[in-house]
Amino acid sequence: MNTKQLKWFFLIVLALIWGSSFILIKKGLVGLNPFQLGSLRMIFAAGFLLIIGFKSLPLIPFHQWKYIALTAMFGTFIPAYLFAIAQTQIDSSVSSILNSLTPLNTLILGALIFKLDFKRSQISGVIIGLIGSALLILNGAMHHPEQNYSYAILVLIASLCYATNVNLIKRHLSDLSPLSISTGNFTVMLLPALIILYFSGFFEVIEIPKVQHSVIFIMILGTVGTGIANILFFKLIQMSSPVFATSVTYLIPVVAFFWGLLDNEMLTPVQFIGAFIILIGVYLSSKK
């Protein structure tokens, strides 16, 4: 494959992997609390990456470890817990749709912090995307009173974290291999994740069958949805642009919504409209 074909291949594979992550989180929360889930996700990913990528760690120059730590925090550590907490209160399909604001947030942060230029159509995209988000959240809160849609703000914060991560990688880590970045990230996160897991009460409930069942889902999420996916994503950022790489979030809701339907989740007609408006906003904000 040439570079153009390869970047689209990576984009589709990532959409399939990450679109399935939201239902894995939902299944994991059956037997785990959010802090146990987030910690196990990172521990499984770290174990997998250290096995295949340990030899790549010495290739990271000392002065770049601060950016490895920052991308670890914004790209995985904080979002891993935010998504898990949010999905205790809102559907996985709603969470995935709000996550599609990542390219829009990438553009905003790129302009405000990393001094990238805005265009008029992109400003329109930002406004339209925010309108769609408000519609999705407010209508969901009205029609699903059993869900606490104030937790949707956690998904929006996670989206901002992802956007920060993408800009940092493109600006400061483009010369490193994706395997080095991924392995470095999870090496940094391993000890904090183990500490949080220890104090989460996980080892008191590990023998309960539903907990063990949930751990299997999170093992898949950690190794495939986090470990392998991160390597592909970092490679995609390096071979394309931050906005193209984060446009994977156009496709993620389609996959996540399919899984949600199989698990008896349903959006209202107005929420469908809100989701469509968000995607229009993201599309406009991504246009060059």
Predicted regions and their residues:
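Hydrophobic alpha-helical transmembrane segments of multi-pass integral membrane proteins
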Residues: 6-10, 36-51, 70, 121-131, ...
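Hydrophobic/small/kink-forming positions within alpha-helical transmembrane segments
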Residues: 16-19, 23, 50, 73-77, ...
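Specific transmembrane alpha-helical segments of multi-pass solute transporters/efflux pumps
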Residues: 17, 21-22, 50-99, 135, ...
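Membrane-interface helix-cap regions at the ends of transmembrane helices
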Residues: 20, 24-27, 31, 45-61, ...
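Hydrophobic/aromatic residues within transmembrane alpha-helices
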Residues: 28, 37, 41, 86, ...
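A helix-boundary/kink motif common to multi-pass secondary transporters
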Residues: 33-34, 91, 114-118, 177-178, ...
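C-terminal transmembrane-helix exit sites in multi-pass transporters
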Residues: 48-58, 103-127, 254-273
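Hydrophobic transmembrane alpha-helices of multi-pass small-molecule transport proteins
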Residues: 49, 69, 118-140, 193, ...
